[in-house]
Amino acid sequence: MFGATVGGAVILSTNILSTQGYLQTARNAFYDQDYKTVYQATFGMELDDSESDGLIKAKSEVIFKIQRRYDSYRTNLKMGRKIEALDALLQGIATYDFINADAEKYGVMAEVEAVKADILNTLEAEYNVDETKARELINNGDALSYTTELYDIISGN
């Protein structure tokens, strides 16, 4: 019985220390504006978003949702996947609309707006697509015509 109690205490303390280590990693990453690392370090954790660590997780998740679209654009571009790269930028605009209320709730509008600005600047500079045109493309309900329009943009038509 004593062995089981000691074993249980060791496992419990190991889990607590492990969780604290992940939370410290998340805190450091948040202050370094590395939202992907925060997301990875806190993935699966049930944290109260009214407390410090939960708030860091919630803020980072909101920012990371749009940031990963821009990161996806850069990754696809490096891999020569031009259509997927353009689609990632457009999905970033759609993501912005989806996360807007949460960004306001958690006080991260400035960070989200900065990523949106990067996306819009890239759309304009690389594809000659402004926000109005981007929203028209996003709202195209037909997958085939959407893809055709992306091909036309890539080819300069």
Language model regions located:
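Generic serine detector
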Residues: 13, 18, 50-52, 60, ...
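Structural signature of alpha-solenoid helical repeat junctions
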Residues: 17, 51-52, 57, 62-65, ...
